Amino acid sequence: MHFQLEMVTRETVVIRLFGELDHHAVEQIRAKISAAIFQGTVTTIIWNLEGLSFMDSSGVGLVLGRMRELEAVAGRTILLNPSPTMRKVFQFSGLGPWMMDATEEQAIDRVRGIVNG
């Protein structure tokens, strides 16, 4: 499991996940993301799932937990480009409304309120 965390604006972080996300990798990712949220600047997380090949229930818990943390700052979450299998998992978990098929740039523009077309 490999991941990248990039602050694209003062309020928005993009998390790129690669490989397999299981309970072994979740703790490291959770600590970094929660630290950014609790510093008080992050209000939006864009999870780029394009490079993710597998995620178990601990990965869903990771996303749900960060969504709860963001609720305290009226934050938002975007689940970007999940695979067909992960799309089903997110839909069954009630996370369907947060999914988006787009580029990172389009997701960032949506967060900023810029809508093209």
From Swiss-Prot:
- Which Pfam families does the record match to this protein? STAS (PF01740)
Identify residues that carry Phosphoserine: S58
Q: Which GO terms describe its biological process?
A: sporulation resulting in formation of a cellular spore
Q: How is it modified after translation?
A: Phosphorylated by SpoIIAB on a serine residue.
Q: Which UniProt keywords apply?
A: Phosphoprotein, Sporulation
- Judging by the UniProt lineage, the source's domain of life is Bacteria
Q: Identify a single GO molecular function assigned to this protein.
A: anti-sigma factor antagonist activity
Domain STAS span(s) in chain numbering: 2-115
* Membership in a protein family: Belongs to the anti-sigma-factor antagonist family.
Function comment: In the phosphorylated form it could act as an anti-anti-sigma factor that counteracts SpoIIAB and thus releases sigma f from inhibition.
The name under which this protein is listed is Anti-sigma F factor antagonist
Q: What is the scientific name of the source organism? A: Lysinibacillus sphaericus
Gene name in the database record: spoIIAA
